[in-house]
């Protein structure tokens, strides 16, 4: 029985074991799942629910679901099995999910059974199903405004659909909570309204006379009705009625010389009052006609400037100063410009005929240089005469020249705003050629310089240093040839016919041969600096250096010039035009218009400035008009250069040195320095509220002088006894001019400080042999910039030492002279300050006179020594309270002598006549008084001061 039960049990176990090994089917799950998980939660709600089925059920292990596996990169979820028998499962988040980080998650899931036994052998897996999990948002974020403060401006009297828009954003991820549903104005009683999009408009017309600035608070709500944590502030400014105009410019613009280019309108902008424009044109005009001749140019004289610019010499002045040698300009009206240059006025009925011989330097014979190579240079101020209009020509110069081949002729005329040059190479055979230029400078009634270079067949006209090519060149066969006779006329021209009878409206002028010339085409305007030079022509660089304007309008920002912008500057740089179609681009371009003055020492003063604007609008009916802008540039006073002359102010030399062939140098160690004082503002201390100024001296590297003068302090030089010497060869080599008179010596011409130092150190003072001169004072002064800046007055005192042993004397006389010389010889440190005697009489070279002088000198010495000693003793006795019986009257020299050592050397000349000695003594006493008075007058500080103040002006 027992065996039977055991057998049955084993059979059943074998049957069960045989059944578990039959895991024939894989688990099954849905193909796709949709899941939802709430933000900040971890449970996922799936649709359909997560169940896995296995056809091996109800077998143990093979029919059970042991778990789920998730596949995907970085899946923040996990799957758990709730019931192995039913295959129910659950998906949950490993940690709370964030919707703002990721709204949706997609991954795959797979189920697996328990296999064929507890060890999980022969496990089978289901297919992979796709799971989509959406994270549901929670309204955790409040709206946030993009700006904390919003500003806008409105014009009074208008209703705006939108003044400005405020904007808030929400950090939530869902459309429900991330969208702003509406805005609200929290401040009550404001004339503004805000819509759901944040647009603010005014509900009534605002007035500038009322509230000028409105401030109110705005908040925002999302669609979950959550309010913004921080509200926004809004400021709306009310402006007066808009007037189209230029804004942000200064009427006064200060320019410091040497500042380079200075922007005139750095902050300017065009207010169009919202009127759309399609074209803008602005003209900036700088008025410089009142500065010298039309604009600021180099301040040097014409002669100095020609040397600085390297211009060739040999020009002939055709309109010189009226004088005995230049009487042809005597009948013209003469004026002077601000730079003291000579100006001639031609009134339309006057002309001058320049003589071909004599001072003009033109000669009456053949003039080869004027045939086809010459430069004509002049200043002209001309406008269209109302009575003449633009119909009649006006002749500037008319010239017929005789050369080897015959006669040539040229004339320069103006006709309205045209200037024409007619050239006839050869009257006998060639035909005339006419060159025409149309220039606004010809008729603008302003000063301009013209230089015409003729190198036939090439003709170039320079106006203010800028070259212009002819606009038209043509042959003119209708012109009748002029009479074949040399003649040069300025201000008019003669007709071609030779007739002694005057015609109506024509004047006659006699020629050199006595035949009259019928004159017509008179010039009406101003001329100055009219010169001609034959042969070598002036180069473009030289002409530009001589006559170009050094100030004007400037524009250099072409790289950032916007699209469609145009910039035009006239040749004289006094007019600049801008044209464009975009307001912002136009503003940017106008902000870079600048004023420039390249002169280191610019002419100070005011330059008026005008900005004129013309605009074109899309709507002609409502097109705006921009008013004119007027201002001025103030060129400040430049830092004046300080020219300092220094050196030895006193020296003494023996007379033999002055009588040498080269004399004695007056300024052997002269030093000339030039510096500029700059006023700079130092950084003020925190405890000091004022401004601290400091003066800094900075030496300039390059400086020129244009003249120096050596003059006499006191009487003029006596040409028979003294003279000033200077090396003429050295001056001529450097192109300097010398004027040497008995009152002064001047050096004129532009040169560097080093050259002037070298030349002035060579200036020497020479005396004739035997001239009894003892002292002289010389005054030296220099200047630059045509005398605009002057140096200090450097005074040198020269003492001439005369020796008494220049002729033979007895030994006892010589010893007396030596004693006298020792008695009056000053110590070495006072050698340059010895008193000068103004004794002008010649010394009598006789032994008797020498003896008389020695005696008189000895007597004077004794008197002086006695007076000094008595005065000293009187002071000592008075100070110590001497005996009552002692007399202290200093007027009595014979009262007493002290017992100090006194050595007296007497010259025993008692055998000589006492009468002569007495006479000589009286004469010597008178002479001493005169010398004393003259010496005091010469060395009086008030006298020197008076002479310095009354010193004559520069003569160079």
UniProtKB/Swiss-Prot annotation:
UniProt biased composition (Acidic residues): 927-937
InterPro entries for the chain: Cadherin-like_dom, Cadherin-like_sf, CLSTN_C, ConA-like_dom_sf
Record's signal peptide: 1-19
Domain of life assignment: Eukaryota
Gene Ontology CC: cell surface; dendrite; endoplasmic reticulum; endoplasmic reticulum membrane; GABA-ergic synapse; glutamatergic synapse; Golgi membrane; lipid droplet
Gene3D superfamilies the record matches: 2.60.120.200, Cadherins
Cytoplasm found in the keyword field: no
Glycosylated residues (UniProt): 299, 327, 347, 507, 740
Extracellular membrane side: 20-847
Any one GO molecular-function label of the UniProt entry: cell-cell adhesion mediator activity
PTM comment text: Proteolytically processed under normal cellular conditions. A primary zeta-cleavage generates a large extracellular (soluble) N-terminal domain (sAlc) and a short C-terminal transmembrane fragment (CTF1). A secondary cleavage catalyzed by gamma-secretase within the transmembrane domain releases the beta-Alc-beta chain in the extracellular milieu and produces an intracellular fragment (AlcICD). This processing is strongly suppressed in the tripartite complex formed with APBA2 and APP, which seems to prevent the association with gamma-secretase.
Membrane-side (Cytoplasmic) residue stretches: 869-956
Membrane topology: Single-pass type I membrane protein
Alphabetical keyword list: Calcium, Cell adhesion, Cell membrane, Cell projection, Endoplasmic reticulum, Glycoprotein, Golgi apparatus, Lipid droplet, Membrane, Postsynaptic cell membrane, Repeat, Signal, Synapse, Transmembrane, Transmembrane helix, Ubl conjugation
Knockout consequences: Mice are defective in both excitatory and inhibitory synapse development. Mice also show reduced body mass and increased energy expenditure. Mice also display reduced marrow volume and cortical bone mass without alteration of trabecular bone microarchitecture. Conditional deletion in neurons leads to a significant reduction in number of excitatory synaptic inputs. Conditional deletion in the cerebellum causes major impairments in motor learning due to a large decrease in inhibitory synapse, associated with a robust increase in excitatory parallel-fiber synapses in Purkinje cells.
GO biological process, one term: inhibitory synapse assembly
Matches recorded under PROSITE patterns: CADHERIN_2
Regions that span the bilayer: 848-868
Subunit field text: Interacts (via cadherin domains) with both alpha and beta isoforms of neurexins (NRXN1, NRXN2 and NRXN3). Directly interacts with APBA2. Forms a tripartite complex with APBA2 and APP. Interacts with low affinity with KLC1. Interacts with SLC23A2/SVCT2.
Free-text domain note: The cytoplasmic domain binds synaptic Ca(2+).
Cited function: Postsynaptic adhesion molecule that binds to presynaptic neurexins to mediate both excitatory and inhibitory synapse formation. Promotes synapse development by acting as a cell adhesion molecule at the postsynaptic membrane, which associates with both neurexin-alpha and neurexin-beta proteins at the presynaptic membrane. Regulates the balance between excitatory and inhibitory synapses by inhibiting formation of excitatory parallel-fiber synapses and promoting formation of inhibitory synapses in the same neuron.
PANTHER family: CALSYNTENIN, CALSYNTENIN-3
Family: Belongs to the calsyntenin family.
Protein name per the record: Calsyntenin-3
């Amino acid at each position: 029985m027992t065996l039977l039960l055991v057998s049955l049990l084993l059979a059943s176990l074998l049957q069960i074991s045989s059944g578990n090994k039959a895991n024939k089917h894989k688990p099954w799950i849905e193909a796709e799942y949709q899941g939802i998980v709430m933000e900040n939660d971890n449970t996922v709600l799936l649709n359909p629910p997560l169940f896995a089925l296995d056809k091996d059920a109800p077998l143990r292990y093979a029919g059970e679901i042991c778990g789920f596996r998730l596949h995907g990169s970085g899946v923040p979820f996990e799957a758990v099995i709730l019931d192995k028998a039913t295959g129910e499962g659950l998906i949950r988040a490993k940690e709370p999910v964030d919707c703002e980080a990721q709204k949706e998650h997609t991954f795959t899931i797979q189920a697996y059974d328990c296999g064929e036994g507890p060890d999980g052998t022969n496990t089978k897996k289901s297919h992979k199903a796709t799971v989509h999990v959406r994270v549901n948002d929670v309204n955790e974020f409040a709206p946030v405004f993009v700006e904390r403060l919003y500003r806008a401006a409105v014009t009074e009297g208008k209703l705006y659909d939108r003044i400005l828009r405020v904007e808030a954003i929400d950090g939530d991820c869902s459309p429900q909570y991330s969208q702003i549903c509406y805005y609200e104005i929290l401040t009550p009683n404001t004339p503004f309204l805000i819509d759901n999009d944040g647009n603010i408009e005014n509900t009534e017309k605002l007035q500038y006379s009322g509230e000028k600035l409105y401030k109110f608070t705005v908040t925002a709500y999302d669609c979950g009705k959550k309010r913004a944590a921080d509200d926004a502030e809004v400021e709306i400014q009310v402006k007066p009625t808009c007037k189209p105009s230029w804004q942000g410019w200064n009427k006064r613009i200060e320019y410091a010389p040497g500042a380079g280019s200075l922007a005139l309108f750095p902050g300017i902008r065009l207010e169009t009052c919202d009127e759309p424009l399609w074209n803008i044109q602005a003209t900036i005009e700088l008025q410089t006609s009142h500065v010298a001749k039309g604009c600021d140019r180099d301040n040097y004289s014409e002669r100095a400037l020609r040397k600085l610019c390297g211009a060739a010499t040999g020009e002939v002045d055709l309109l010189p100063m009226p004088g005995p040698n230049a009487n042809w300009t005597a009948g013209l009206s003469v004026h002077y410009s601000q730079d003291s240059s000579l100006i001639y006025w031609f009134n339309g009925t006057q002309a001058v005929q320049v003589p071909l011989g004599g001072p003009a330097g033109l000669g009456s014979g053949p003039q080869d240089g004027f045939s086809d190579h010459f430069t004509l240079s002049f200043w002209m101020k001309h406008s269209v005469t109302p009575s003449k209009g633009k119909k009649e020509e006006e002749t500037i110069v008319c010239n017929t020249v005789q050369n080897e081949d015959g006669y040539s002729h040229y004339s320069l005329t103006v006709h309205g705003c045209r200037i024409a040059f007619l050239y006839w190479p050869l009257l006998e055979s060639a035909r005339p050629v006419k060159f025409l230029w149309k220039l606004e400078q010809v008729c603008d009634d302003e000063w301009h310089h013209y230089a015409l270079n003729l190198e036939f067949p090439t003709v170039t006209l320079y106006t203010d240093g800028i070259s212009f090519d002819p606009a038209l060149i043509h042959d003119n066969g209708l012109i009748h040839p002029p009479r074949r006779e040399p003649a040069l006329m300025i201000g008019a021209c003669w007709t071609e016919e030779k007739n002694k009878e005057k015609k109506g409206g024509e004047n006659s002028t006699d020629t050199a041969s006595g035949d009259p010339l019928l004159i017509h085409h008179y010039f009406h305007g101003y001329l100055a600096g009219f010169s001609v030079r034959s042969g070598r022509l002036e180069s473009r660089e030289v002409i530009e250096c001589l006559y170009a304007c050094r100030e004007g309008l400037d524009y250099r920002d072409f790289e950032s010039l916007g699209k469609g912008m145009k910039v035009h500057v006239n040749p004289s740089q006094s007019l600049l035009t801008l044209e464009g179609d975009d307001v912002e681009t136009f503003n940017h371009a106008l902000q870079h218009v600048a004023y420039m003055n390249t002169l280191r020492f610019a002419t100070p003063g005011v330059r008026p400035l005008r900005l004129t604007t013309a605009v074109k609008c899309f709507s002609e009916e409502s097109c705006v008009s921009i008013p004119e802008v007027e201002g001025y540039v103030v060129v400040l006073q430049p830092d004046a250069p300080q020219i300092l002359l220094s050196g030895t102010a006193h020296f003494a030399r023996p007379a033999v040195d002055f009588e040498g062939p080269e004399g004695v140098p007056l300024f052997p160690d002269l030093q000339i320095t030039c510096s500029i004082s700059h006023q700079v503002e130092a950084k003020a201390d925190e405890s000091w509220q004022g401004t601290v100024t400091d003066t800094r001296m900075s030496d300039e590297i390059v400086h020129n002088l244009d003249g120096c003068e050596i003059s006499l302090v006191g009487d003029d030089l006596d040409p028979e006894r003294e003279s000033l010497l200077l090396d003429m060869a050295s001056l001529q080599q450097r192109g300097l001019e010398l004027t040497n008179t008995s009152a002064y010596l001047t050096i004129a011409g532009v040169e560097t400080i080093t050259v002037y130092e070298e030349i002035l150190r060579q200036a020497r003072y020479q005396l004739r042999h035997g001239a009894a001169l003892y002292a002289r004072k010389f005054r030296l002064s220099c200047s630059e910039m045509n005398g605009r800046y002057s140096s200090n007055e450097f005074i040198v005192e020269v003492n001439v030492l005369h020796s008494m042993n220049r002729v033979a004397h007895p030994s006892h006389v010589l010893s007396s002279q030596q004693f006298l010389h020792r008695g009056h010889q000053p110590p070495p440190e006072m050698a340059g300050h010895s008193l000068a005697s103004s004794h002008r009489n010649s010394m009598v070279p006789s032994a008797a006179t020498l003896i008389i002088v020695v005696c008189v000198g000895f007597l004077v010495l004794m008197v002086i020594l006695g007076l000094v000693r008595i005065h000293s003793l009187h002071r000592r006795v008075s100070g110590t309270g001497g005996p009552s019986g002692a007399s202290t009257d200093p007027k009595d020299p014979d009262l007493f002598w002290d017992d100090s050592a006194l050595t007296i050397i007497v010259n025993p000349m008692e055998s000589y006549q006492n009468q002569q000695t007495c006479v000589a003594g009286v004469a010597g006493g008178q002479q001493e008084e005169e010398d004393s008075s003259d010496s005091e007058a010469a060395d009086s500080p008030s006298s020197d001061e008076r002479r310095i103040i009354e010193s004559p002006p520069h003569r160079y």
